[in-house]
Amino acid sequence: MLKSDVWFATIDELSPEIRSGRLSSVELTKGFLDRIDKFSARFNAFEHPTPDLALDQAARVDSDLKANHWRGPLHGIPYAAKDLFDTRSVPTAWGTKFLRDRVPDENATVIDRLEAAGAVLLGKTAMVEFAGCLGYRFANASATGPGRNPWDPSRWTGGSSSGSGAAVAGGLATFALGTETWGSILCPSAFCGLTGIRPTYGLVSRAGGMVGAYTFDKVGPLAHSVSDCRTVLAAIAGADPRDPSCATEKTKLDRGAGKQWRNLHAALVPLDWKKVGEPEVKSAFDAAVAELSAAGVRIDDTPLPDVPATEVSGLLIGMEALAAFDPFLADGRVKQLVDDMAPRQLELGQIVTGPDVTKALRIREAIQREMREFFMRFDVIVTPNFMSVAPPVEQDLNESLPYGDPVGALAAACGLPGLALPAGRGKAGMPVSFQVVAAPFDDATLLDLGDLYQARTQFHRAHPALA
């Protein structure tokens, strides 16, 4: 019988156990598969569990270990992947009901890279339809129903990587892959009390994955610690001829590769907490800022550039999604989506003109210039992920989260990396989170700063008690 703490253990904790032979990947994988059978439906975590594949991969890496072939820290570690990454001979439905018979012939690049690193795929996690690129108003905009938060199943996981958040927070996988166009990694990380990184645009290949907004979409992990995020990111990052958007130069992600934290200058975004924020979230966020300050980070209140990032990101994402999903509009299948906002968005997109898009692209370039200048004065931005905890699953998200992520639109427009860090508990005992955001390809600074914070706090070790 495996100890209960393995379900919420980090890669750093599990890896030595597997390498030493004290724990086999098959044993660990069987345990996670049992938990998926027991808990997945409660949280709408998995769309397609892959028990046969998982046990085959686990047996293979155990055999490798007996032959003294150690693949690295992910050797034998069970994980889950958002159901928009192609997986050979496994259905990949992009969060929809009408694509459930779609079975790819090959793997996405990130799936191949994780397999090469020795990780074991437990299955494909549920997600918001088309990753939310067409917009959605309700948490149930998914083939599996709303993502239910393991901390309280009456509340949302966040999206669009809803199942990835539920799987890791519920102890159904050690880590999970998510994607983000605008908030889809950091949101479920925040609401589920996880550590998650949205890498710089172009750092990780999207080849073999659903790409709804080509110049916005990123791939990254949700995990139990910054160190785990670093390990996974190092395994999946890098140039890929299958994805022309990938950076060709290698980005250093090793510990200490970022800017020295003692010299970091952080911009603290002023927010109107009296208007929209929850006091418990503010208290937890203030304590996190104080912790960073005590560690030596210089923090100054500074507003973000006053630019129309929300409007520009919204228009361009909509147009790119229209191009990506046009076949489903043409054949009428878009009307089968659960949330009625998506087909209306596609129809509205058809009235946007070429000059509208050209203007938006020019404004986006200006926004990116503004942010390059901003990061000449500051190394990172510090802000809450949200000013409230996870909302009830039945609420209209436009009403329960009217202000969203304070820096989400800017980060989307500029391809900025961001790191979500657990910061305690708020209303109804739900997780509170904050984020640090850096300039493009300064992901290592975020990881180093996150390591510093998690060395001084234990919020990332908290997990829900499941029975």
What is the predicted function of each stretch?
Residues R198-S283, R456-A467:
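A short helix-breaking turn/cap at a secondary-structure junction
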Residues H75-W94, Q260-P270, G318-R372, A420-P431:
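Short helix-loop capping/hinge segments that flank enzyme active sites or metal/cofactor-binding pockets
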Residues E106-I236, A412-Q435:
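Short glycine/serine-rich loop segments
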Residues T92-D101, E278-P279, P391-S400:
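Glycine/threonine-rich flexible loop motifs
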Residues R22-L33, A59-D62, P279-P303, F325-K335, ...:
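Acyltransferase
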Residues M1-Q57, A294-G296, I351, A462-A467:
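An N-terminal boundary/leader segment
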Residues G21, G76, A116, V120, ...:
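Glycine-rich, small-residue loops and helix-cap segments
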Residues D64, N68-N140:
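Acidic/His- and Gly-rich active-site-bordering loop/insert found
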